[in-house]
Amino acid sequence: KKNWGQYFTPLKVVRAIVNMVELSPGMKICDPACGVGKFLLEPILHDLHRFYVVKGDKLIPQITLTGFDKGFDKDEQKTIILAKANMLIYMSGLIKENPGITQEFAKLFNDTFLLQTNSILGTLARPEKEQYDLILTNPPYVMSGSSNLKEEIAKQTELKDYFSISAMGIEGLFMEWIVRALKPGGKAFVVVPD
């Protein structure tokens, strides 16, 4: 548990889930509640060259990673900053070996971890359909504030059509988002409460 009222997945749980994943070139992987980015970054720790190829001054992603998190105030925004800092740490060896890719990395870095500030819904305000081959996540599980989220969804026609709004709590909304965001045949590894 963190001072910011957020819960982060223990690293041993992240690693156990990541070890179950089968990766292939061209995959698009997402964590819709990425926090500090561990579900997306842990797979690259031991196999960085499977994810990124360097050709001259070009950094070419072989697998696309996308992490979303929400942030209205400075404390919430720190989480996505930490995800980007983690990415820099995980890729520091590659950058050190290839100093010409720093601008490419800066773009990748900002395209990978995206802060959602436009709505209390965060990622849920992005009605994505059949975009990802793999989703790895530990979405938030809270009941308080869920009615506010459902009210916000009800105000927006596109979101009202996207969500059934019958889900209990924010975790139900995230589960619905995950199912809709997966490509046909895609897989999701989701931490759920007991």
Each model region followed by its residue ranges:
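Conserved Class I SAM-dependent methyltransferase catalytic core
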Residues: 164-194
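Charge-dense, intrinsically disordered terminal/linker segments
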Residues: 125-126, 130-133, 146, 175, ...
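A mobile, often basic/glycine-rich helix-loop segment
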Residues: 145-167, 194
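A glycine-rich, aromatic-flanked flexible loop/lid motif
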Residues: 141-152, 178-185
